[in-house]
């Protein structure tokens, strides 16, 4: 089997996840067009590059993006860096003729996103984004139901993405809390996933109103530091939007949701039925079909749990009956991108999808006053 070389730009939390996803592909799929190999990792400092090599055994590590992109044995660059660096890496990868698999959100602004789009169009660069929630099996099934007409005309969309890890005021500043590096807070971090899912499942959105709050306005600059820095990004946000048919929608995101771990909820209501998904119950999709008969004691009507587990449509080695894990959607997303790289059909997020999400974020932040 032909092998394809992958270089990972950034080896923090999400870089590690992408490495695991690509390396896991041969253990999940029997139809791989290429065998992926992690051949290089770029980190911010030489010492962390050496640590990454010790942990992974990757043959090449560097702290230079140029060195990573210039290697002839690397064909795909995975962008897993803070948002402020996305444009630079995409530019260098495009000039070097590499394919790009970019983490979310696409960029810091619409201006940057459009520059990336121009580069992709001019160089015919193969470009994909890791909006992996498209590849949760239950979400995939929801897309099928919507396309088949089970929901009917969309009446309402409601989503929430809830974390609780930022409620401790002693938690120090990090790049995700620095506006000049992240571009935004909870909405950019968590809301980008929901914005993409809504766009993917039910179409375009127009932002109508948005609110945001920063609950802890100052944090230690680093662990145990007496120096405080101002926090200029949102801890909580709520965005009201409309679909093309004027159906209302709302998205709420929070990194201060006490008691939540990593909970994403999505509800889509229509003239014929309703779909509900909660990431804390990832093996199931709730489905209500209004066409089922009512009657004494309820008839046949009611929400039904569709058992999606790991029943992915591609040939894979893992039994579909097995409970699904969080990393599984990342693995499926990486598989889809590898298919795209090989010239096959893809349902993964494109740069145009990334631009739609960027527009959603930028409009929302302008209405919040977080520009």
Language-model regions, residue ranges each:
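Beta-strand-loop-alpha-helix segment that lines the small-molecule cofactor/substrate pocket
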Residues: 76, 82-134, 149
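N-terminal Rossmann-like dinucleotide-binding module
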Residues: 1-56
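Short acidic low-complexity segments
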Residues: 30-32, 60-72
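C-terminal helix-rich "cap/oligomerization" subdomain common to oxidoreductases
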Residues: 26, 30, 76-78, 321-371
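Short active-site oxyanion
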Residues: 36-40, 58, 75-77, 184-185
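Glycine-rich phosphate/pyrophosphate-binding beta-alpha loops
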Residues: 192, 252-261
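C-terminal glycine/acidic-rich active-site capping loop/insertion
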Residues: 221-234, 238-243, 266, 272-349
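Predominantly a Rossmann-like dinucleotide-binding segment in NAD(P)-dependent oxidoreductases
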Residues: 126, 133-231, 285
